[in-house]
Amino acid sequence: MGEKKKILIFAHYYAPDTASTGQILKDQAEGMLEEFDVTVICVVPSYGGTIEDRYKTKKYYFEELNGVKIIRVRVPEFTKSNKISRVKNILAYFFGALGASRKAGKQDYVFTISQPPILGGWLGVLGKWQKHAKMIYCIQDFNPEQTIAVGYSKNRLVLKLMMIADKFSCRRSNLVITVGRDLVETLKNRFKNKNLPKYTMINNWIDEKEVYPLPEDNEDVLAFKKKYGLENKFVIMYSGNIGLYYDLEKLVKVLKQFRKGYTLKGVYESGPLTTDGREVVFVFVGAGSVLDKLVMYTKKHHFENVIFIPYQDKADLIYSLNAGDVHWCVNAKGIKGVSCPSKVYGIMGVGKPI
């Protein structure tokens, strides 16, 4: 067998961070090792905004995880609800990743994702030029379309420049990957079906050996329920990023109709009950830019049957997902064709209704 081809992956987040794209890229990177020499460039573990002291002293950290070479870029801590701190964090990764790529040596391929928005694509383009390599651009979310859909920015000039920049990244790619059929249509619409870049569709996934259905009496599932007060409850769960793109603020306002003390046929003073007598509770597992708003709203309106649980380690994801009786998989209005909710794969993995 000849020498392996080399591929450089700009991941933004990577294991052990709990970001869904980081977990997917870990699976991908490790799955490519038989045929490729794989190097990943990412931030130091910091998805929650805080950083361990051991990752605060050097500019770059060189590691290896399960055969994958990793160059971690030091970035400043941030607060997900603070735009300025997030921008500083993202720019630190962008410029740090460019510097890290020079330390990655010769590469045959550069693989990048659409995160951070726009800049992820530009990392791929600049990495391609720097390495004289072929570029693969995996679009998990289309921007500025996503930014427009949630009203994050209404500055027409900024949005126009974002579109020009990301279309440039698409055109410079040797292959564009989208993660859903609707995203393919969005790509076609961007270019009005003319001079389309070469593209293919590859869905995201879940490892069915790691996330699968468990019986209700599984000890670890019961331990999770006990830890968070979910015993003998009917659990309606949202698990994932509690961010802008899911309209969770409106969802929580609807839950006002189901709080304890609300009386309606089939809904008792203790709160809504199932036919077998279990109290219905609404559980949000994760973190994100709107989490604090949701917590404040539920406290203000005395929601006693809404529970917030921190992100779970990937090893524990199987237990938290199995603890839900029904799962929400929601997107904000306008997100169709712009983003594909990868959380659906975990829900299907444990065999729960959506």
Regions found by a protein language model. Name each.
Residues A223, L230-Y246, V252-K256:
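Conserved donor-binding/catalytic core segment of Leloir-type glycosyltransferases
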